[in-house]
Amino acid sequence: MALLDFFLSRKKPTANIAKERLQIIVAERRRGDSEPHYLPDLKRDILAVICKYIQIDPEMLHVQFEQKGDDISVLELNVTLPETEETPK
């Protein structure tokens, strides 16, 4: 009887398979594999505020976003300050 069921069973429609694959892709993206869309603007704004007080090279500012678990996000900010103080321009 199992052999008969094998040949008479219907395959899943391709629409259902595509839907399942899309749900997997969306779930992976929500998991935090990519950085937030606002991160470049945030980095630019932070650099502007720092430059009001001390002149630094934009390459000396590093911003990193990490997703830890479902409800914890970490924003790490590293600024390399020059050894001598310069007045802002």
UniProtKB/Swiss-Prot annotation:
Coiled coil: none annotated. One of its GO terms (biological process) is division septum site selection. Keywords: Cell cycle, Cell division. It holds the Pfam family MinE. InterPro entries: MinE (IPR005527), MinE_sf (IPR036707). One of its GO terms (cellular component) is plasma membrane. NCBIfam families: minE, PRK00296.1. Prevents the cell division inhibition by proteins MinC and MinD at internal division sites while permitting inhibition at polar sites. This ensures cell division at the proper site by restricting the formation of a division septum at the midpoint of the long axis of the cell. Belongs to the MinE family. This is Cell division topological specificity factor. It comes from Yersinia pestis.
